[in-house]
């Protein structure tokens, strides 16, 4: 019996917002996945400044995902004492899900940088990639990178189209600091949690 097709969606999620959910939904439907696992990073190697605690980010993800049975959140990276790298996470998840097909989900911006990641070239050969188009990266540049990685590393890449949504976690943090409206950019449960815990101020 064939295993499940599971997408791995890592990030800071600082905080999780509607753009993350749209990206995951598009990847889920277009790549015909059975499940998407959100994996918040404990110590993002490239985002050390302004990252709130893993407990807050994990709880916000749980609240944001509770309506979606096909989505789950894992604390696998929180259990490490060292910075979290995608390659290490994929290695661990392959051991945890030996009978399933794992896919790594990334945006167009991540795809442009992936060969510079820790063991990024090996990652391309280890797991199929679901690459999602994203505002800020032109379609031509995105598709050229897809073709380059396929040719250079024989990477398996599934291209997913996504509506342009100009939402980022940094935008939300900025709006909170500047006391501008932001509730329309995140799930209501996440908004309530941020307010209740006085985060990002």
UniProtKB/Swiss-Prot annotation:
It holds the Pfam family CTP_transf_like. Its EC number is 2.7.7.18. It comes from the Bacteria. SUPFAM superfamilies: Nucleotidylyl transferase. The keyword Ubl conjugation does not apply. InterPro entries: Cyt_trans-like, NadD/NMNAT, Rossmann-like_a/b/a_fold. Keywords: ATP-binding, NAD, Nucleotide-binding, Nucleotidyltransferase, Pyridine nucleotide biosynthesis, Transferase. GO terms for molecular function: ATP binding; nicotinate-nucleotide adenylyltransferase activity. Pathway: Cofactor biosynthesis; NAD(+) biosynthesis; deamido-NAD(+) from nicotinate D-ribonucleotide: step 1/1. It catalyses: nicotinate beta-D-ribonucleotide + ATP + H(+) = deamido-NAD(+) + diphosphate. One of its GO terms (biological process) is NAD biosynthetic process. Transmembrane segments: none annotated. CDD domains: NMNAT. Catalyzes the reversible adenylation of nicotinate mononucleotide (NaMN) to nicotinic acid adenine dinucleotide (NaAD). NCBIfam families: cyt_tran_rel, nicotinate (nicotinamide) nucleotide adenylyltransferase, PRK00071.1-3. HAMAP family: NaMN_adenylyltr. Belongs to the NadD family. This is Probable nicotinate-nucleotide adenylyltransferase. It comes from Carboxydothermus hydrogenoformans (strain ATCC BAA-161 / DSM 6008 / Z-2901).
